[in-house]
């Protein structure tokens, strides 16, 4: 290898970004070919193409000019597993890992050179996780896995800025949205639900509809959330299909036992504090939260009056997953508030 003068730090960073943009785009192309020709799935193919093209916009001539393939000591390195791909699943798994690792590298090194690229890589990485689940798991398994990992859950409230607020929260990392609207006409609800579903899909978040199984079906939602006075869960599954999520609100041990017997995919636990979202409902406090933590086999989302001023109390009481309404819907900066709520929930995780 020819001895060259040491490259500047900026030059080295550009080489790292160039190499990993190449790696991510190549891996996505391999995955896209199977989505297109193997699965013949137009939606998954379009998602792969959008991911590739989004990365391509950041793969500038400046980054390409930093490339020094003949001086790269890594080009001669290989591993036996790279030469052995015995099954289709092995090919897909290897290329998903390749893309995810490359995006993480871009995210971290992009913080030093291009914060927009870094944030984009982070968002794309989560979309790739969803894509992998769609290809390697059945739809219900994929949704359940995503639900299990969702720390924060936004239940919407009517607002003239609804889409703007929800998108800001999604940019902040929100993994789960429930559309709740008790007053609008059905045409408005369906139109809004479809807009929210498209937003959630773009950011790789789950989307549920409150109460209305028909709206959930019409909007292609990931599932529905039922209250105690709504239709039986089995009927909801018959209408929606067995691959969708169904959650249930609970306020006491008897309601929790019913939800467990029905096979709820998750439960809401609350209201922890008094809240105008549920007027006339007495706060259940932390005793029921701790009971649910001990007895419920499915994810439990603490809900009711939770915000930045009291979330640490809720975490100390045992909650690991939290649902909020006003904390985000009424926030001056929904994106920053979402990030802070997620940060505190992450800090509260058991080590």
From Swiss-Prot:
Cross-referenced SUPFAM superfamilies: Thiamin phosphate synthase
Binding sites annotated in the UniProt record for 4-amino-2-methyl-5-(diphosphooxymethyl)pyrimidine: 178-182, 210, 249, 278
Required cofactor names: Mg(2+)
Region named Disordered: 64-84
Stretches for region Unknown: 1-127
Stretches the record annotates as Thiamine-phosphate synthase: 128-351
Keywords: Magnesium, Metal-binding, Thiamine biosynthesis, Transferase
MF-aspect GO terms: magnesium ion binding; thiamine-phosphate diphosphorylase activity
A matching Pfam family: ThiD2
UniProt keyword annotation of Magnesium present: yes
Free-text remark on how the cofactor is bound: Binds 1 Mg(2+) ion per subunit.
Annotated GO biological process: thiamine biosynthetic process; thiamine diphosphate biosynthetic process
EC number: 2.5.1.3
One GO location term (cellular component): cytoplasm
Binding annotation for 2-[(2R,5Z)-2-carboxy-4-methylthiazol-5(2H)-ylidene]ethyl phosphate: 275-277, 305
Catalytic activity from the UniProt record: 2-[(2R,5Z)-2-carboxy-4-methylthiazol-5(2H)-ylidene]ethyl phosphate + 4-amino-2-methyl-5-(diphosphooxymethyl)pyrimidine + 2 H(+) = thiamine phosphate + CO2 + diphosphate; 2-(2-carboxy-4-methylthiazol-5-yl)ethyl phosphate + 4-amino-2-methyl-5-(diphosphooxymethyl)pyrimidine + 2 H(+) = thiamine phosphate + CO2 + diphosphate; 4-methyl-5-(2-phosphooxyethyl)-thiazole + 4-amino-2-methyl-5-(diphosphooxymethyl)pyrimidine + H(+) = thiamine phosphate + diphosphate
Chain positions recorded as Mg(2+) binding sites: 211, 230
Function: Condenses 4-methyl-5-(beta-hydroxyethyl)thiazole monophosphate (THZ-P) and 2-methyl-4-amino-5-hydroxymethyl pyrimidine pyrophosphate (HMP-PP) to form thiamine monophosphate (TMP).
Family: Belongs to the thiamine-phosphate synthase family.
HAMAP family the record matches: TMP_synthase (MF_00097), TMP_synthase_cyanobact (MF_01327)
Protein name, UniProt field: Thiamine-phosphate synthase
Name of the encoding gene: thiE
């Amino acid at each position: 290898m020819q001895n060259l003068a040491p490259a500047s730090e900026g030059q080295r960073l550009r080489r790292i970004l160039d190499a990993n943009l190449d790696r991510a785009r190549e891996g996505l192309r391999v995955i896209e070919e199977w989505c297109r020709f193997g699965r013949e799935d137009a939606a998954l193919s379009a998602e792969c193409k959008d991911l590739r093209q989004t990365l391509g916009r950041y793969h500038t001539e400046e980054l390409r000019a930093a490339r020094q393939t003949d001086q790269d000591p890594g080009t001669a390195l290989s591993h036996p597993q790279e030469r052995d791909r015995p099954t289709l699943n092995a090919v897909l798994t290897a290329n998903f890992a390749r893309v995810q690792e490359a995006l993480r590298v871009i995210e971290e090194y992009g913080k030093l050179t291009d914060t927009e690229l870094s944030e984009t890589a982070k968002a794309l990485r989560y979309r790739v996780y969803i894509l992998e689940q769609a290809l390697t798991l059945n739809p219900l398994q994929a949704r359940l896995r995503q639900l299990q990992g969702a720390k924060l859950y936004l239940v919407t409230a009517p607002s003239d800025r609804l889409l703007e607020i929800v998108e800001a929260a999604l940019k902040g990392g929100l993994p789960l949205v429930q559309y709740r609207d008790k007053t609008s006409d059905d045409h408005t609800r369906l139109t809004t639900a479809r807009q929210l579903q498209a937003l959630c899909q773009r950011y790789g978040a789950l989307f549920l509809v409150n109460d209305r199984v028909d709206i959930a079906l019409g909007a292609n939602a990931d599932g529905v959330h039922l209250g105690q006075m709504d239709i039986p869960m089995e009927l909801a599954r018959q209408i929606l299909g067995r691959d969708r999520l169904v959650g249930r609100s609970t306020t006491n041990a008897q309601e929790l036992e019913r939800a467990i017997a029905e096979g709820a995919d998750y439960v809401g636990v609350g209201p922890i504090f008094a809240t105008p979202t549920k007027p006339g409902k007495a706060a259940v406090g932390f005793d029921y939260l701790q009971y649910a933590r001990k007895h419920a086999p499915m994810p439990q989302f603490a809900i009711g009056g939770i915000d930045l001023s009291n979330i640490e109390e809720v975490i100390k009481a045992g909650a690991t997953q939290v649902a909020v309404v006003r904390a985000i819907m009424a926030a001056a900066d929904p994106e920053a508030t979402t990030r802070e709520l997620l940060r505190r929930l992450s800090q509260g995780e058991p080590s």
